[in-house]
């Protein structure tokens, strides 16, 4: 993709706190957790929350999603929409295999829901970039950039993909 980028953005609290509260409330519903093979190792991941009733009916969560989308649209000056959003919680020793999303979306994001001293998100670019998880920080990047997450003790993130309207 032309003009590839990686941005580290700090969002206002209580956005991450409210999103984390929703995750803690709904992660115990077995219908929200996917069993499909993903790049997530030693962790749990939701199906697309845009399609899950618990999250669709939660007004606070929907307001948070709208806030994230509006922030990104304003930052990029583009008309965008969500194509997917997932929660991922990494357990002790959890990590994310290197991958990209070029086949699915134009832009990707990782919103950190807690602060960790490990579990950096890394990007396979020159020079290499590695970002430690800090609550309220969101990494926004071009979807074709290879990325992964290093081993962690316990990390919670909201990840998503966005497309431009044609």
Residue ranges and their predicted role:
Residues 77-166:
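Catalytic core of non-heme Fe(II) oxygenases with the double-stranded beta-helix
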Residues 1-78:
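Non-heme Fe(II)/2-oxoglutarate
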């Amino acid at each position: 993709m032309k003009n590839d980028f990686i941005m580290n953005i700090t969002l206002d609290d209580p956005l991450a706190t409210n999103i984390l509260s929703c995750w803690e409330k709904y992660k115990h519903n077995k219908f929200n957790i996917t069993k499909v093979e993903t790049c997530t190792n030693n962790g749990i991941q939701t199906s697309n929350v845009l399609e899950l009733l618990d999250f669709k009916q939660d007004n606070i969560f929907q307001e948070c999603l709208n806030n994230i989308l509006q922030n990104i649209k304003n930052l990029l000056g583009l008309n965008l929409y969500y194509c997917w959003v997932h929660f991922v919680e990494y357990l002790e020793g959890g990590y994310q295999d290197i991958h990209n999303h070029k086949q699915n979306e134009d832009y990707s994001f990782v919103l950190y829901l807690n602060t960790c001293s490990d579990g950096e998100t890394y990007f396979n670019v020159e020079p290499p970039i590695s970002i430690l998880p800090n609550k309220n920080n969101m990494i926004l990047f071009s979807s074709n950039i290879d990325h992964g997450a290093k081993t962690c003790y316990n990390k919670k993130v909201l990840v998503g993909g966005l497309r431009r309207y044609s």
